[in-house]
Structure formats: C-alpha cells, structure tokens
Design a protein with these regions (language model features):
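Bacterial N-terminal signal peptides
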Residues: 1-6
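OB-fold and OB-like single-stranded nucleic-acid-recognition modules
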Residues: 10-164
C-alpha cells in the first residue's frame, strides 16, 4: 500500500497552458462539471437577478461535509439563480483546471465572509475572463500546474459593483 501511494505522490501534476484569456490547453476540470457547463442564459428580466454581498452568500447553507463533489454533482437551489455580486477584490488566482477564481469580501469590510467567484473556461465566459485578465499584469501564454496568484495592475478596481 505504501509503495502505491508513494508512486502516485511522485506523479507530475498535469499542466494547463493559458494561451489567451479565453483559451486554455490541457485544462482538466472535473468537479461539478454539470454546473460549469450549464448553458442557461442570463435572464433578460433584470428583476430576476438578485443583488447580494459576499457575507450574505457566506451565510448560506452549503452542500454539507458529507457530499462528494463529482463531475455529476447537481447544482443547489441557490446555484440555479443569477446574482449581481458586489464586493472588494481580495485575490485573483488561476487554477490548474483553467478556471479563474476571484476572492471577494464585503466592500465595507464590516462583515465576516469571503467567497470565491469562479469563472470557467468556455465561450460563454470569455468576455468576463477578458475583463478580469485586463485588471492584471499577466502576459500570455503561461503555464501552471497548481493554483497561481495573478498580480493585479495598479489601475485594477478594488471593488466590483454589479448594478444589474
């Protein structure tokens, strides 16, 4: 058993190359693939989009510790809605699965909770990915094997305000 575990521990991590903000080679996202590939369009009725803050999302009940996340894990009811999220940018990372993760806290800084807005690879998300990479000093192409923090430019916004 130890030898098997040791052999897997020494396996090289797969690489993903970010060719451009919208194109990745070798991305290998698998957890919650159903959620990431959902083609539901943004509602045309802006009243259907609820404004929220990171602390409000942080207070929501999650899937629970006993739920195994797989490619087929369905979306929770709260994930089946569209939200206008306003928050202060804490961190921006790219993941080895090709996703961009933006860590956000409340813009006021007064409430507990940091949430991650995940932007997957795909044509549907290209415009948002271009905007996020536009806030950074990142040059293309680049390759990662693990999560990689992206350096923000001096002109990057400190707060994202979504006014629907």
């Amino acid at each position: 058993m130890f030898l098997v575990a040791s052999a897997f521990a020494n396996s090289p991590a797969p690489e993903v190359t970010f060719v451009s903000p919208c194109e990745c080679i070798g991305f290998h996202g698998k957890n919650r693939w159903v959620t990431k590939t959902d083609l539901t369009p943004v509602p045309s009725d802006k009243a259907a989009i609820q404004s929220v803050t990171p602390s409000q999302i942080y207070a929501w009940e999650g899937l629970g510790p006993d739920v195994e996340l797989t490619a087929m894990t369905e979306r929770m009811p709260s994930e089946q809605k569209w939200y206008a999220l306003t928050g202060r940018i804490i961190d921006v990372k790219v993941e080895a699965d090709g996703d961009i993760h933006i860590a956000l806290s409340d813009a006021t800084g007064n409430n507990v909770g940091t949430v991650s807005a995940e932007i997957p690879v795909g044509l549907k998300w290209c415009e948002i990915r271009q905007t996020v990479f536009g806030w950074t000093t990142q040059k293309f192409p680049f390759t990662v094997k693990t999560a990689h923090t992206i350096k923000m430019s001096k002109s990057a916004p400190q707060t994202i305000v979504n006014n629907q």
